[in-house]
């Protein structure tokens, strides 16, 4: 078989769409970066069904906001506002 007769597999180029950081307020980063541990609506979006903290790629957070979210989730777990283990 010649190389021309073979069908070439073309890799699909994905266009990355920027996810909006859920911590940002009106498109701007709050300074200082602080996530309230009592905001259970936001924190429950950052935790999956098993109770694990979602990674940056999945949640769309920047590094600074991911650190703040992680600290807030751990604080809320300690205060018994969020469960350590999910369903």
Swiss-Prot record:
UniProt-listed GO biological process terms: translation
Family listed: Belongs to the bacterial ribosomal protein bS18 family.
Keyword Thylakoid: no
Biased composition (Basic residues): 1-19
Region described as Disordered: 1-25
GO cellular component: cytosolic small ribosomal subunit
Domain of life of the organism encoding this protein: Bacteria
GO MF entry, a single one: small ribosomal subunit rRNA binding
Keyword Transcription regulation applies: no
InterPro entries: Ribosomal_bS18 (IPR001648), Ribosomal_bS18_sf (IPR036870)
Quaternary structure and partners: Part of the 30S ribosomal subunit. Forms a tight heterodimer with protein bS6.
Function in brief: Binds as a heterodimer with protein bS6 to the central domain of the 16S rRNA, where it helps stabilize the platform of the 30S subunit.
Disulfide bonds: none
Name of the featured protein: Small ribosomal subunit protein bS18
Keywords, comma-separated and alphabetical: Ribonucleoprotein, Ribosomal protein, RNA-binding, rRNA-binding
Organism: Rhodopirellula baltica (strain DSM 10527 / NCIMB 13988 / SH1)
